[in-house]
């Protein structure tokens, strides 16, 4: 029998157990200090590569009391300075740097501390996967149903994956879904972040559509080698049940982007985004006042006005 993630040292020490335990409906607290916040990381980590970069950086905020959720995406080229014990760099290397300092969980811990310092959002848990892990999760769910507003066409050389999708509803397998969330050919980082948020909702939809809640413990154990997390099985089931009870209008999306929150620039020969952390800290707290998730994850005002990149 496969060992559950609960037995892993990665699961034994939540990033902020005391903080999560003290969550309460206190109107004096900022909204994202009243939520359970999960850092979701997706990297290009491979066995043959000594280092890696993080392509997916999202914060999933769950307000368990009010029945709302928010998804905040951070582009990978956001410049971070300072980074404790390291030179300033893009945010997409911080997971790697943290693991060099403290193997088996130091990366999410370092990134969580930087997010809290710069954005004022406490991180309680993390979920981290690489390319193979992502494909295994999607295939274990039986694929994901995604409706496109605009065509997506790309070839990912490093993974030898070609994708060409028309603006209709598709069922994507793990390999296709990986290309969908990694492609930057249409719309760059901003559109890629929106597609990644759509995949979060597609996972929820697939679990509900196939009535897979009873299979969560088996999936949790089977994905032991593909996904690292500090979320225990009991909490995982609780969070899945919470997600299944959400309606589209209960979920709000926020993608950090230019020109107000991020400004393009160069540092050390790298193309970067310079963040206005003061404005970001203020704006992310308004996430539950923003339009529903799927409205902010469409390209145009409505289907008749879609403007594709």
Residue ranges and their predicted role:
Residues 1-309:
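Non-catalytic, solvent-exposed segments at the cell envelope interface
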């Amino acid at each position: 029998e496969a060992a559950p993630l609960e037995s892993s040292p990665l699961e034994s020490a939540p990033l902020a157990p005391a903080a999560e335990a003290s969550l309460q409906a206190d109107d004096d607290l900022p909204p994202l200090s009243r939520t359970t916040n999960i850092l979701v990381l997706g990297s290009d980590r491979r066995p043959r590569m000594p280092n890696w970069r993080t392509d997916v950086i999202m914060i999933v905020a769950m307000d368990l009391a009010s029945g709302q959720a928010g998804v905040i995406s951070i582009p990978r080229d956001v410049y971070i300075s300072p980074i404790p014990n390291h030179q300033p760099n893009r945010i997409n290397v911080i997971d790697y740097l943290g693991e060099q300092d403290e193997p088996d969980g130091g990366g999410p811990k370092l990134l969580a501390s930087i997010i809290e310092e710069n954005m004022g959002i406490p991180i309680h848990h993390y979920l981290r996967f690489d390319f193979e892990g992502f494909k295994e999760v999607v295939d274990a769910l039986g694929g994901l149903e995604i409706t496109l507003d605009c065509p997506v066409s790309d070839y990912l050389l490093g993974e030898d994956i070609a994708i060409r999708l028309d603006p209709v509803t598709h069922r994507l397998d793990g390999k296709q879904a990986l290309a969908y969330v990694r492609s930057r050919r249409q719309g760059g980082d901003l559109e890629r972040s929106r597609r990644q948020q759509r995949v979060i909702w597609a996972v929820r939809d697939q679990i509900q559509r196939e009535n897979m809640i009873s299979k969560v413990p088996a999936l949790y154990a089977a994905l032991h080698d593909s996904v690292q997390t500090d979320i225990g099985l009991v909490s995982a089931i609780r969070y899945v049940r919470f997600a299944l009870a959400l309606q589209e209008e209960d979920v709000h999306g926020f993608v950090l982007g230019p020109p107000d929150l991020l400004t393009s620039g160069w540092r050390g020969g790298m193309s970067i985004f310079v963040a206005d952390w003061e404005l970001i800290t203020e704006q992310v707290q308004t996430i539950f006042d923003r339009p529903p998730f799927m409205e902010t994850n469409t390209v145009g005002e409505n289907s008749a006005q879609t403007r594709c990149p």
